[in-house]
């Protein structure tokens, strides 16, 4: 997990995600590093989904 990976995933979560995923992106940005790790570990599948997301 790199900063670029997280940044791209969050950008796509904001742009293409539903209300839950958009809220998760907001929470992640506001969280301290320990809580960011908790959120990432709990929702890793969503981070991977949105880092690869293409609007075709």
Question: Where is each model-derived feature located?
Answer:
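Short intrinsically disordered terminal tails
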Residues: 1-4, 52-56
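Short, charge-rich amphipathic interface segments used for partner binding and complex assembly
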Residues: 21-55
């Amino acid at each position: 997990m790199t900063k670029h990976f997280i940044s791209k995933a969050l950008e796509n979560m904001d742009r293409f995600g539903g209300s839950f995923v958009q809220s998760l992106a907001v929470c992640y940005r506001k969280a301290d590093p320990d809580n960011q790790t908790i959120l990432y570990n709990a929702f890793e599948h969503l981070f991977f989904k949105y880092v690869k997301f293409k609007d075709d």
